[in-house]
């Protein structure tokens, strides 16, 4: 049977980093085996599900490059199908109506706890064969097997056994006429032919219940792979503050989508000591059975390292649109400065994110209005007008403005004055950027443009003259 996996988020919020890893592993497993990847939106929680959250999930999937073969399929559009299957179970005596009030259910739980037993439904209506009636407390409960054990071999966790005596008769249809999670996902996965269910290990306790429903329906049981959670850098549960952010916040923070994909792939899975993978290598090497059963820790420094690798090695033209996105967020007029691809070349060895790159690049897009006082005192003092003036003269005469032609002009200026290159470069660097730190001086001047560079040199000469 062809592999079919699914990613099934609930649209009650954004797609966080743990959900993105789940989607990636489902996508990789399907792609590696030549199967299909299905996107299902589990939106039966009508109070908390929102269209904004759905849109955010779809946007994040697109940004990450996790295309799906089917979907998005919405559970709210399948309610009639869930009712059909529930009625089938009722007709076969595998489910039943129950009408207990909230107070009665609370009393059951309190009685169980008083006996130091697990709070649960006591099966009061199990054998009463109650008919349907219009009642605000009406639910449909599944007749869980009383004896025996549920056994399944998890692809990550290994063999898991749960005694049926640990499970009660769970509700499969609520009073509001909607199915519960454990029932809907079984019907969905059955109808959609899902062969591997890859999800977080917070769902392990749901699995025995779901397997019993599969058995009652005579449906094939998929294989299960329960991934351990992602912890923060301190080894505690992720929070918004420690990394469990909206995937699109990683975009806003300046990470490349394929860098995040590479990092997420390694967050729980490995292939020897290899850290960096091309997309094809991930498709060739990934196997969900190789996912570690222990929780992984988020390491933002490692993510930054991976991101910097791709900033250094990707085609600058492919990075440019994402840098332009960051510059636009800073209110920069892109037409007022250099081509973004040229900025990438100049800065990519110096930053870990595109956000850092954009912040450093602003100096070439906006008028230089402030100077570092220490830099001015050290490099724009009396005497600096000589190398600055010579550099200006030769830069003004450059025919074709390029990094190479700028470099030649600056070296000629140093040679003409019999100065070391640093004596020309440092005052020029302060004149162009207002600071003592910048990329290679030829790139720094080139990115300012001929007109911009000459104007900034003139301003520096004026500053020296006024000192």
Swiss-Prot record:
Motif 'KMSKS' region: list the residue ranges.
Answer: 237-241
**Matching CDD domains, A to Z?**
GluRS_core
Which segment of this protein is annotated as the motif 'HIGH' region? 9-19
Tell me the PROSITE patterns matching this sequence.
AA_TRNA_LIGASE_I
Main subcellular location of this protein, as a coarse class: cytoplasm
Q: Where in the cell is it found?
A: Cytoplasm
Please state what the protein is called. Answer: Glutamate--tRNA ligase
Q: What is the lineage of its organism?
A: Bacteria, Pseudomonadati, Pseudomonadota, Gammaproteobacteria, Lysobacterales
- Gene that encodes the chain: gltX
